[in-house]
From Swiss-Prot:
CDD domains: HFD_H3. GO terms for molecular function: DNA binding; protein heterodimerization activity; structural constituent of chromatin. This is Histone H3-like centromeric protein A. It comes from Mus musculus (Mouse). Histone H3-like nucleosomal protein that is specifically found in centromeric nucleosomes. Replaces conventional H3 in the nucleosome core of centromeric chromatin that serves as an assembly site for the inner kinetochore. The presence of CENPA subtly modifies the nucleosome structure and the way DNA is wrapped around the nucleosome and gives rise to protruding DNA ends that are less well-ordered and rigid compared to nucleosomes containing histone H3. May serve as an epigenetic mark that propagates centromere identity through replication and cell division. The lineage of its organism: Eukaryota, Metazoa, Chordata, Craniata, Vertebrata. Belongs to the histone H3 family.
Length: 134
């Protein structure tokens, strides 16, 4: 039989900083972290704007399309070609991107930076019933 290990005693955690004004170094560190996170967001936005890739994954989108098709065709199952699903997905993404662009313009017009549901609702109301792409 090999040597036995001694049971480890729980170690004490380091004491938390005293309440009161924080030190200058911690605020500087949090500012650089925020700045780094901001640049990461901006970098992600720029890469997404440059790319022409699809934003939705293909499998979940095809499942939603099949479910909607089954609902409106009263249980009749249709076969979908891959090219047809791809064309439908590109059209759906273009529609949503254009909708969000217009809704964001409305939020900027209202003097806000945050996009609210009421901006999207107003965009759809301005566009009308069949407010597709221009």
């Amino acid at each position: 039989m090999g040597p036995r290990r001694k049971p480890q005693t729980p170690r004490r955690r380091p004491s938390s900083p005293a309440p009161g004004p924080s030190r200058q170094s911690s605020s500087v560190g949090s500012q650089t972290l925020r700045r780094r996170q901001k640049f990461m967001w901006l970098k992600e936005i720029k890469t997404l704007q440059k790319s022409t890739d699809l934003l939705f994954r293909k499998k979940p989108f095809s499942m939603v399309v099949r479910e909607i098709c089954e609902k409106f065709s009263r249980g009749v199952d249709f076969w979908w070609q891959a090219q047809a699903l791809l064309a439908l997905q590109e059209a759906a993404e273009a529609f949503l991107i254009h909708l969000f662009e217009d809704a964001y313009l409305l939020s900027l017009h209202a003097g806000r930076v945050t996009l609210f549901p009421k901006d999207i609702q107003l965009t759809r109301r301005i566009r009308g019933f069949e407010g597709g792409l221009p």
